[in-house]
Regions:
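Conserved ABC ATPase signature
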Residues: 84-88, 92
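Catalytic Walker B motif of ABC-type/P-loop ATPase nucleotide-binding domains
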Residues: 109-112
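H-loop (His-switch) and adjacent beta-strand-loop-beta switch element
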Residues: 158-170
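H-loop/switch region of ABC-family ATPase nucleotide-binding domains
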Residues: 145-146
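Conserved catalytic motifs of ABC-family nucleotide-binding domains
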Residues: 105
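Conserved ABC ATPase "signature" region
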Residues: 65-80
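ABC ATPase nucleotide-binding domains
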Residues: 176, 184-214
Length: 214
């Protein structure tokens, strides 16, 4: 999971990884044949457009009924294929976006603030659904999130970003890192209120692994 303050480059990183924007420097290496599913932070669809969930999932190419039903079930909205996209609740809309990302059974699922706008219960359900998807497909999951207290309980590895990698590793190691605390304070429950960080006033120790982490 990638965390960091607003404007730190989290969404830019994901868009670069999927090839949606050019690189100023560096390079991205992708395994041949790697299937990537992407759930954007937001997507605007004209509410006057007569677009059903099924038609949305068939863009840009058509899929069979079984594949669509399976993707919707995995995303947590079974039986909604014939519903209008404009009629979906915020949580259902996000799950429809996830279903679209799951259509080709990706090897890597990327999510950019995909739980944004969900209440606490909806967020918890969303993360549980992600765990089920990971178990069913055996895919890797790379996500950007502001839900720090959830991230630190659910993620296997955390990258703290602020225009560069401040620290990374196991969640317990990251929360103990001074670079992370300079950004978010010491209480991850209140971390969203603290976004103070000078990238030039901390040591650039970019790997802080818990010595017991595998």
């Amino acid at each position: 999971t990638v965390v960091g303050p607003n404007g730190s480059g989290k969404s830019t990183l994901l868009r670069a990884l999927i090839g949606a924007m050019p690189l100023d420097s560096g390079r991205i290496r992708r395994a041949p044949g790697l299937r990537v599913g992407y759930v954007p932070q937001r997507l605007h669809i004209d509410p006057t457009l007569p677009l059903s969930v099924r038609r949305f999932l068939n863009l840009p190419r058509r899929h069979g009924r079984h594949a669509i039903d399976q993707a919707l079930a995995r995303a947590g909205i079974p039986g909604r294929a014939d519903a209008a996209m404009s009629a979906l609740s915020g949580g259902q809309f996000q799950r429809a976006l996830m279903a679209r990302a799951l259509m080709d059974e990706p090897d890597l699922l990327m999510l950019d603030e995909a739980s944004q706008g969900l209440d606490q219960t909806g967020t918890a359900d969303f993360y549980r659904q992600l765990e089920e998807i990971r178990d069913q497909l055996g895919c890797g999951i790379l996500m950007v999130s502001h839900d720090l207290h959830v991230v630190m309980r659910a993620a296997d590895r955390v990258i703290c970003l602020n225009h560069h990698i401040c620290c990374q590793g196991h969640p317990e190691a990251v929360t103990a890192a001074p670079e992370y605390r300079a950004l978010f304070g010491t209480d991850d429950e209140e971390a969203l209120a603290i976004f103070r960080h000078d990238p030039h006033k901390h040591p650039h120790e970019h790997e802080r692994e818990d010595e017991h982490a595998g």
